[in-house]
């Protein structure tokens, strides 16, 4: 889907959709639990659907129902399964260890850039603990055998998803296990989300220094009903929309959440936006934005929308560092941000691990790609508020990966677009 975005001014209120990251985690632990679970969740994205379908293939019975998701857990382990992860990196990285802990011989398929996204650190540790993989660099990925407990060592600067996958699986094994994480650890808040979810479902994990001790033989105990938090990652786009143009209120976000992307509030405030936090709502109003320095190691998903705020600034230079891992996301996200903003007249340059963006204020119009990347599409849509002309955006359907109703909410806040043929 190609769209024409027109200059606009954002004003209004939206409710945050449920966190995709939280929903992934709740679905997996619910599928491994002792009894059914109802997850209150208002999001039905392509990634969440992929996780639901994969868990059903492993023996769960999960359905989207009014108000959320109904989960009947896996009762009988299946000897074999085919899991279509679509384009979801979270799904394949979380479920590789889970399937191996169940002893299910599994074929993992998928599309988009999923075959290119790294699995080697996780693969090496699983192979060292009894799991047989199909040849390296071959997709689909096939595994055989049941994973055994023991000591696992993972680098912390490639993907926290490897650690999360092991944290889900290791409590199910017969013996005790340890995960040693080699510093530096990036995206640490996502590990904290996993630990919180495990605790809700009765799983004990002890953290000491850079390691996690996981007793074996544990049972997941469902609390019956749980709620997926509001999504700070996707809400960041509309919070930033308020900062660059007008005034936007987002409801349904928890300021005490461990989601790392709530840091968007700190960043926007430091850049000069006016922010009001009240019971149940957050309002961001346009301010006199200026450039700042940002370490993105724990907030890589915010880089596209932070770059939009930086481009809209009236003063100073924004330097983003620690974002090297963006090269292996749904797109080479560093290159995507650079190329698209450059094409729209933004004064931007690349570094080895980030970007340097000089004040631009009003950007130009033009034609850009969405890079089949949901976060790029949403960021460029927000950028239309400070454009001097129309922006033609190709591949806008990529929002379905995480936020299928994005353009409905975009329009409700004053965003202006129409679908075009070319």
Segments (PLM) and residue ranges:
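Short, structured segments at the rim of ligand-binding sites
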Residues: 1-422
């Amino acid at each position: 889907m190609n769209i024409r975005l027109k200059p606009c001014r954002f004003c209004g209120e939206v409710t945050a959709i449920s966190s995709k990251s939280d929903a992934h985690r709740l679905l997996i632990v619910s599928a491994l639990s002792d009894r059914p679970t109802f997850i209150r969740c208002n999001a039905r994205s392509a990634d969440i659907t992929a996780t639901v379908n994969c868990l059903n293939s492993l023996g769960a019975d999960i359905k989207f129902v009014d108000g959320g998701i109904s989960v009947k857990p896996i009762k009988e382990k299946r000897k074999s399964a085919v899991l279509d992860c679509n384009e979801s990196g979270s799904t394949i990285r979380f479920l590789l260890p889970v399937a191996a802990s169940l002893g299910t011989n599994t074929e993992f398929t998928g599309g988009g850039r999923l075959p290119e996204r790294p699995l080697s650190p996780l693969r090496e540790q699983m192979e060292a603990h009894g799991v047989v993989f199909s040849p390296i660099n071959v997709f689909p990925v096939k595994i055989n055998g049941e994973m055994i407990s023991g000591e696992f060592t993972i680098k912390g600067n490639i993907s926290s998803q490897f650690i999360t996958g092991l944290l889900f699986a290791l409590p199910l094994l017969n013996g005790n296990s340890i995960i040693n994480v080699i510093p530096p650890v990036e995206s640490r808040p996502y590990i904290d989300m996993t630990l919180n979810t495990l605790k809700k479902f009765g799983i004990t994990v002890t953290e000491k220094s850079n390691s996690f001790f996981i007793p074996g033989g544990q049972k997941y105990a469902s609390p019956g009903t749980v709620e997926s938090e509001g999504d700070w990652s996707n809400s960041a786009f509309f919070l930033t929309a308020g900062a660059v143009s007008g005034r936007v209120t987002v409801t349904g976000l928890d300021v005490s959440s461990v989601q790392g992307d709530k840091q968007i509030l700190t960043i926007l405030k430091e850049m000069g936006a006016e922010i009001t936090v009240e019971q149940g709502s957050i309002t961001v109003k346009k301010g006199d934005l200026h450039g700042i320095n940002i370490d993105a190691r724990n907030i890589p998903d915010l880089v596209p929308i932070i770059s939009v705020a930086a481009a809209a600034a009236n003063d100073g230079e924004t330097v983003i560092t620690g974002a090297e891992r963006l090269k292996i996301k749904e797109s080479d996200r560093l290159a995507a941000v650079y190329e698209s903003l450059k094409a729209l007249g933004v004064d931007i340059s690349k570094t080895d691990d980030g970007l340097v963006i000089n004040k631009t204020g009003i950007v130009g119009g033009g034609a850009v790609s969405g890079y089949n990347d949901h976060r790029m599409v949403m960021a460029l849509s927000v950028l239309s508020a400070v454009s001097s002309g129309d922006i033609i955006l190709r591949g806008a359907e990529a929002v379905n990966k995480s936020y299928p109703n994005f353009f409905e909410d975009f329009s409700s806040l004053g965003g202006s677009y129409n679908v075009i043929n070319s």
